[in-house]
């Protein structure tokens, strides 16, 4: 496996100027109502629940303070239920986020801290290198990732 110094690569990369923001991620689920109950139990906002006949249904939900939502439903993805893994949720305090999810009845792994690879800019605390995993009822995997300070270049200027 090879690695690239991202700070060198990004300094020479031509960055796009068109404003593009990730809006929605589609989750494959087997039971729409069960998934809706699960994500509501996490405290996620229900944005829409739209049915078109008996063949199509779309539910949109948004995690607290997130600019990106999730879609799931019936009749609009060929992905196998539970096939998405490593969907990241950035949190400022991973221990508090983990405790909140456990209090809501979610099975969450212990917090795992990864060593900081050499060559990355230093950020305080465990930013980017502390994780905890949980799964929805279909097995789609979510990673809590603690980020208290963004790495240089990770903030877009308005």
PLM ranges: what are they?
Residues 68-70, 142:
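Short beta-strand segments
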Residues 73-96:
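Helix-adjacent hinge/juxtasegments
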């Amino acid at each position: 496996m090879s690695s690239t110094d991202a700070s060198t690569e990004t300094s020479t990369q031509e960055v796009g100027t068109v404003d593009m923001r990730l809006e929605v991620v589609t989750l494959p689920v087997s039971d729409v109502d069960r998934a809706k109950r699960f994500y509501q139990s996490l405290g996620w906002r229900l944005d829409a629940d739209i049915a078109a006949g008996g063949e199509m249904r779309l539910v949109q939900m948004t995690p607290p303070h997130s600019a990106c939502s999730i879609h799931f439903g019936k009749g609009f993805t060929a992905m196998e239920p539970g096939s998405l893994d490593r969907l990241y949720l950035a949190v400022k305090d991973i221990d508090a986020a983990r405790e909140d999810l456990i209090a809501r009845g979610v099975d969450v792994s212990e917090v795992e801290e990864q060593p900081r690879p050499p060559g990355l800019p230093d950020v305080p605390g465990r930013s980017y290198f502390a994780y905890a995993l949980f799964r929805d009822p279909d097995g789609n995997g979510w990673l809590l990732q603690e980020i208290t300070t963004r790495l240089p270049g990770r903030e877009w200027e308005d």
